[in-house]
């Protein structure tokens, strides 16, 4: 190995332990990551404790000697690397992208003249993505004029230049060039896809200028373009196309789901809305466009009783429920409405006026109280109560997980759940705590309904651990609960003491309550990674090899900094190898490399029965994700 040439790929710190990934020169281009400088190194074989191991064409080692830093802008360096590369297929993509990105077209020329081929079908990066803003037009022209070498699809170049640049001279040149070589490009589709990528519905001055260039060059279908511009409400292009005399069928335009603003452009140019065209507008529009257009048609009295049929009413109910109120106010819909459907929609949308309308037309509010509770909204439910509704517990649908959402966390809903014995206080609190923003007032309200000093929350420990694991801190709501609101168990008190740095109290609680071998406390201590606290636990459990094996497994998930401490300072060696390898797969890459460098087999065994592993069962109980394994409480 000593006679080989190596380059440094990456340095990783593992606490106070450094690991280096180095690569032999012949595999350099297989692993380089968008760098313009590289460091030649050699393993420091003479250092005490030196280790090295192979890792998929690269090597892991703990000691290196840096020899020199080289630049990939230096031709001699590049030639030497290329000459030593074993597999030259597709290796030049990085270099071309690097030189394009840095405006080094002279170096691209050198690669081309040296016949170092760019292969767009290889795994190298897309060279167009690296075109810099500075000198963008010149770089694009370079790619276009050398595309017989780059072999990028002309459609991809056209899409990039037209959709993502403001280089109008380049656009003009490219379109004319493609005409000369008889290359057919679907510019209409490019334009449409560009609008979709911009989420549409907004005028883009620069892109509009591009479209005008394409119109001038006569490479787009004006009728198709008008349709696209109408759909995406591109006012400037619609106006421009009409100004240059583009022919169109007004009713066809109306079928394009146009906005009110676009509609007015056509009306201001002499187009007339008759009953047929109004029907088209009413039957094809949905969403916010329909709401605006509908209000305009109502205000201008285009909509008459004759046009209001069941089909229109159904469209409004299904897709634009908020505008139903205006129809109700002006027209007789008594024979056109399914009041059951409308009442449920009104409850879902909290449309109090529509609810009142249904009630005034004979709807029995009591038939919908259960439905309103299932789709609870406080203002809507209160309104139904004020209208004489009473809630029956028969067939009442209650979902405990609803309490994890803000709209259910109010006194009215909580009282209904408690007064009707739909759930226990413990479960109510458990679910209230699951809400991300946490409603302190509601939690206090629930606690004040009972003697909270006697309440036991069996899932609280797991919630605290899961919260700390995912956030690397503890939410104040758990600290408040443990300290003042309830009578927590000693495990909860110990865990809160550890995560709040009150280690003396934690040690006292552990000793007084014989919790020295509790795995949940151990896992939190591993995550906290306080050396003194860990030594305290290890000294008590020094004779329990099983406990020490748990510490190593937890360190792979909880805090990788602790791995080196547990392995080298405490002297724990992995023995539960199936669990060890399984957790290793879910652990951080740095952790895996540490074990590999220290001579351990980290290959994955068959995982068919992994659910039976004790460590998997532990995390399943906590509700902690392990890679592809998803656990919920």
Curated annotation (Swiss-Prot):
Q: Which UniProt keywords apply?
A: ANK repeat, Repeat
**Organism domain of life:** Viruses
- The keyword Isomerase is assigned to this record: no
Q: Where are this protein's ANK repeats?
A: 91-120, 123-152, 221-250, 252-275, 338-367, 369-393, 517-546
Q: Does the keyword Repeat apply?
A: yes
Please give the name of this protein: Putative ankyrin repeat protein L774
Please tell me the species this chain comes from.
Answer: Acanthamoeba polyphaga mimivirus (APMV)
Q: What is the lineage of its organism?
A: Viruses, Varidnaviria, Bamfordvirae, Nucleocytoviricota, Megaviricetes
């Amino acid at each position: 190995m000593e006679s080989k040439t190596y380059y440094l790929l990456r340095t990783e710190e593992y606490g106070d332990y450094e690991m280096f990934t180095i690569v032999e020169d012949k595999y350099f281009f297989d692993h380089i990551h968008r760098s313009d400088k590289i460091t030649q190194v050699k393993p420091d074989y003479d250092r005490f404790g030196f280790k090295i191991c192979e890792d998929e064409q690269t090597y892991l080692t703990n000691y290196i000697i840096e020899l020199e830093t080289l630049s990939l802008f230096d031709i001699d360096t590049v030639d030497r690397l290329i000459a030593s590369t074993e597999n030259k297929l597709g290796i030049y993509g990085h270099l071309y992208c690097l030189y394009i990105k840095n405006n080094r077209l002279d170096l691209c020329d050198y690669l081309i003249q040296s016949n170092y081929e760019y292969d767009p079908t290889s795994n190298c990066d897309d060279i167009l993505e690296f075109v810099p803003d500075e000198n963008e037009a010149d770089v694009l022209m370079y790619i276009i004029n050398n595309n017989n070498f780059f072999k990028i699809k002309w459609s991809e170049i056209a899409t990039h230049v037209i959709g993502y640049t403001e280089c109008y001279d380049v656009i003009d040149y490219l379109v004319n060039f493609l005409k000369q070589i008889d290359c057919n490009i679907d510019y209409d589709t490019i334009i449409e896809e560009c609008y979709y990528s911009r989420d549409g519905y907004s005028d883009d001055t620069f892109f509009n200028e591009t479209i005008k260039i394409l119109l001038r060059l006569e490479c787009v279908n004006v009728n198709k373009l008008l349709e696209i511009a109408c759909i995406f409400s591109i006012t400037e292009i619609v106006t421009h196309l009409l100004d240059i005399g583009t022919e169109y069928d007004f009713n066809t335009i109306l079928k394009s789901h146009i906005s009110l603003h676009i509609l007015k452009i056509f009306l201001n140019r002499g187009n007339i809305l008759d009953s047929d065209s109004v029907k088209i507008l009413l039957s094809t529009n949905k969403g916010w466009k329909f709401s605006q257009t509908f209000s305009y048609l109502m205000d201008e009295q285009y909509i008459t009783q004759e046009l209001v049929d069941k089909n229109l009413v159904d469209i409004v109910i299904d897709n634009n429920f908020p505008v139903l109120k205006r129809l109700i106010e002006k027209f007789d819909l008594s024979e056109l409405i399914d009041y059951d459907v409308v009442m449920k929609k009104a409850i879902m949308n909290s449309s109090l006026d529509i609810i009142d309308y249904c009630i005034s037309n004979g709807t029995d509010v009591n038939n919908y109280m259960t439905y309103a509770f299932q789709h609870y909204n406080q203002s809507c439910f209160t309104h139904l109560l004020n209208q004489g509704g009473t809630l029956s517990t028969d067939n009442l649908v209650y979902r405990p997980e609803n309490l994890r959402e803000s709209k259910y966390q109010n006194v009215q809903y909580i009282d209904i759940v408690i007064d009707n014995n739909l759930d226990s206080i413990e479960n109510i609190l458990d679910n209230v705590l699951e809400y991300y923003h946490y409603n302190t007032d509601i939690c206090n309200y629930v606690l004040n309904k009972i003697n909270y000093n006697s309440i036991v929350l069996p899932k609280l420990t797991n919630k605290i651990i899961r919260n700390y694991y995912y956030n690397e801190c503890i939410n104040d709501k758990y600290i408040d609960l443990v300290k003042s609101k309830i009578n927590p168990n000693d495990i909860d008190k110990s865990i809160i003491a550890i995560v709040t740095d009150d280690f003396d109290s934690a040690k006292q609680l552990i000793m007084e309550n014989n919790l020295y071998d509790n795995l949940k406390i151990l896992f939190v201590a591993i995550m906290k990674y306080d050396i003194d606290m860990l030594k305290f636990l290890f000294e008590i459990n020094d004779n329990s090899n099983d406990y020490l094996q748990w510490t190593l497994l937890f360190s792979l998930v909880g805090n990788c900094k602790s791995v080196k401490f547990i392995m080298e300072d405490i002297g724990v060696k992995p023995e539960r190898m199936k669990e060890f390898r399984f957790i290793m797969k879910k652990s951080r890459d740095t952790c895996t490399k540490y074990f590999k460098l220290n001579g351990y087999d980290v290959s994955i065994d068959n995982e068919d029965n992994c659910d039976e592993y004790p460590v998997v069962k532990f995390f399943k109980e906590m509700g902690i994700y392990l890679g592809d394994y998803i656990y919920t409480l």
